[in-house]
Amino acid sequence: MIDIKVLRENPELMKENIVLRNLDPNKYDVDYILELDAKRRSLQKELDTLKAQRNKISQEIGKRKGEEREELIKKAKTLKEKIEELEKEYEKIEKELYLKLWQLPNFLSPKAPKGKDEKDNIEIKRWGNIKTFTFTPKDHLDLALLNDLVDFERGSKVTGSNFYYLKNEAVLLEFALFRLVIDTLLPEGFKLFITPDLARMEIIDGIGFQPRGPEAQIYRVEDTDLGLIATAEITLGGYHKDEILDELDLPLKYLGFSHCFRTEAGAYGRYNRGLYRVHQFSKAEIFIICRPEDSEEMHEYILSLEEKIFQKLEIPYRVVDICSGDLGAPAARKFDIEAWMPGRGDFGEVTSCSNCTDYQARRLNIRFRRVTGEVEYVHMLNGTAIAISRALIAILENYQQEDGSILIPKVLQPYIGISEIKPKK
């Protein structure tokens, strides 16, 4: 949520922010929000005055007798009724104000590139050499079916379209990838979590999980206030709701493992086939809570950890700085890692990392107390350590052989005990 004081002092900054994010200015009426804020403050001032008058009269009632006392009692009753009336109006305005504030996106980082959509994202780095095949490379789905690693047909029969079974060596790869992530991040001081797969909607809303477009919506559990989480960012972010942390304990570095559920309504096209865009997948999520002055450094740190994992896997990738018009509401700045995917002959997103500054902390009321005594909102950041479905695509396609077999990345071989997956069909 946005600090109303900042909005009050510089409304034009938010108006520009909305335009730069390629959002509809009519949906985010900053001037109306400020009108509500002014009404609320005016009502608060009036209420304070009336309550002071009521308190003064209440004190006088005990000192007076007869008609004078009765007159004061009437005045006190009139004031009470007026106060109750204004409190109802205040509550109504405050509720609308906070709803409007809740909908505003985070302020952009000055370093976030300006642009309209994903076409304006900026490539800032490449790593690794793209392999030249002496044959036409298959895509991951053909390879997975050839090697009996997935079953979409039975997944669809049991659960519905875009659900699947991971099988055989693909299961070993999932656990090996998680083990690689643990062995990479544990020495960095990360605490490990397996989080719930469900969260209250107030937590989901507090995190501000509002992906762009219709492609990633939350599954709601009917007749409850629960939703299936789309990322462990939600459950890790809610872990310290309504808490005041100690400055000396920051940064908090968490690594959370969870299933992720996304309806992915509207997702279609050849790039979305197979494992690229599915309703359920497993993921390890990096989550850091830090002081405001440290968040930019922590953002670069998360990116470096994500890079380290894909470098260990020896998969070529590029790093993309996401432009203003392609950012989700909570992120002030975001980096994506896109791995080379030979099956599509292009890069595809495998990780992201976002600096959400104090946006989520304000919504979830997570603060810290400095050693000097001041209490402030923390900054919160998140990043993908590994998303199994996307990582499998990159491994299968980059490590395929002409006969359809798959070499196991060297770094994963000790976890699995084999060096190659051989076709079974």
From Swiss-Prot:
Q: Which reaction does it catalyse?
A: tRNA(Ser) + L-serine + ATP = L-seryl-tRNA(Ser) + AMP + diphosphate + H(+); tRNA(Sec) + L-serine + ATP = L-seryl-tRNA(Sec) + AMP + diphosphate + H(+)
Q: Which GO terms describe its cellular component?
A: cytoplasm
Q: What is its EC number?
A: 6.1.1.11
Instruction: State the compartments where it is located.
Output: Cytoplasm
Q: Name one GO molecular function term.
A: serine-tRNA ligase activity
Per the record, the major location class is cytoplasm
Q: Which residues bind ATP?
A: R262, T263, E264, V278, E349, V350, T351, S352
Under which pathway is this protein filed? Aminoacyl-tRNA biosynthesis; selenocysteinyl-tRNA(Sec) biosynthesis; L-seryl-tRNA(Sec) from L-serine and tRNA(Sec): step 1/1
Q: Which UniProt keywords apply?
A: Aminoacyl-tRNA synthetase, ATP-binding, Cytoplasm, Ligase, Nucleotide-binding, Protein biosynthesis
Tagged with keyword Protease:
no
Determine if Glycosyltransferase is one of this entry's keywords. Answer: no
Q: Which domain of life is it from?
A: Bacteria
Ligand binding (L-serine)? T231, A232, E233, E285, T384
Q: Which CDD domains match?
A: SerRS_core
Q: What does this protein do?
A: Catalyzes the attachment of serine to tRNA(Ser). Is also able to aminoacylate tRNA(Sec) with serine, to form the misacylated tRNA L-seryl-tRNA(Sec), which will be further converted into selenocysteinyl-tRNA(Sec).
Concerning PANTHER family, the annotation shows:
SERYL-TRNA SYNTHETASE
What the record says about family reads:
Belongs to the class-II aminoacyl-tRNA synthetase family. Type-1 seryl-tRNA synthetase subfamily.
Q: Subunit comment for this entry? A: Homodimer. The tRNA molecule binds across the dimer.
In terms of NCBIfam families, this protein maps to:
serS
| HAMAP family in alphabetical order | Ser_tRNA_synth_type1
Q: What is known of its domains?
A: Consists of two distinct domains, a catalytic core and a N-terminal extension that is involved in tRNA binding.
What is the protein name stated in its UniProt record? Serine--tRNA ligase
